[in-house]
Structure formats: C-alpha cells, structure tokens
Amino acid sequence: GESYVLAVKPSDANLDNINGLIGLLVESDKPIAVNSGSANGTNADYSSGESGQDAGMDQLVPVERIGSEYIFVRGVGPSQVERPLIVAHEPNTEVYVNGNLEFTIAQAGEHYSIPSSFYGVTYNYNNGVGPAINESSSMHVTTSNPVFAFQSLGGARPDFGSGNTTGVPNQGMFFVPPINCQTPRIVNNIPAINQIGPDPDLFFEGVITIVTETGSTVLITENGAE
C-alpha cells in the first residue's frame, strides 16, 4: 500500500522541467499501479506567460495493452490546449494523422504533440457556444509501433462564470485507450445528460460525438424509446 512519487516543478529558470517526465520508463519486479499527470499543469505554452492551469491525471496501462490506432474527439478549448500527445515506446515510430505521415519519433520515450488543426474545426473561446450539431471534430491517428496516447481538451467557456478570457484554465488531460476488439459496442447509460453541472437551471450546451466504422448503424435510446 505504500507509494513512491516522482515530481518536477517547471519554472522560468528551468524550462526543461516542463517535459521532464514525459516518456519516463517505469519498470518493477512485481505488479504496480501507475498514475501520471499534473495537479496544476497546462498544455498551453508555459514560456509565453499564458495564465491558467488545471488538473489532468489518469492511471496508465502496461505496455502490453497499448496499441497503434486511436481516435481523438476535440473538446471546446482553445487550439493551444486541444493537442493530443503521442509517446513512443519504440524508436523510429511513424505517426500518421488522418492517413498522412506527419512525424517520426526517433527514440523510445520521446513524444509528438499533434497540432489541433488536424481536427478541422476551431471554436471561438470568447463565447459560450458549443460545437455545432453534425460537425465532424475527430482525428484518426495510427502509428507504426504501439504508443501511449494522451488527450488534453478544454471544457467550460469563459462566459459560464470562470472569469477568464482565453479558455486556457478550463482544461483536462487523460489517457486514451487504443481501438481494438475490447472497444465497447454499447454505452449504457448517461443519466440526466442535459443537466450537467451543479446548477439545475444551467443546461449543458455541448454535444455527444459518436465515431464509428463506415457502414455502422447507430441506435440512440431515450427513456426507453429509440
């Protein structure tokens, strides 16, 4: 039950600490649980002086469970936040985005931060309008070797009462599982989806994005009726 913590603190005097733990290899002689992330970090450019941080942390899986195909769906954060992170486990790992080779990660443990422009959509972070209905905002990523994948995305808009003007403070980060035979076919259920948040009078203006294989039939049931 004991734990061991590795942590770094970025500063203007030591900017190397910003990426200091990305790609760190952890090995043990017995099974362990590994959590990775930041309690007060940002996917924005720290050296630019952009203010605002938030929590982003998730539990990792062993290397045997990572894969080479991933789907990312954009949130409603600013472009500098909405960037997936790919961490290579093997050298010379090619990264393909939407079918095109975009980058080769030279060494194991190195990473590639994918620009948000590959989502194909951008949201104005100075208003509270969510994504448009039936608008594609996904990114398909494949790699030549298995990789660890993380996604950073933005949430509430500034005029929802956060008090900021850039949207940067409202962000999170999580580990993304690969597409494989374990990908679920049924999501059951999402209760009170139109009332996300503590205020019952505040209705969520976001959308649900469903990404499927070509030719798939998607059935949505609400209150027992399709």
Per-range role (PLM):
Residues G1-E226:
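Conserved functional hotspot residues at active sites or interaction interfaces
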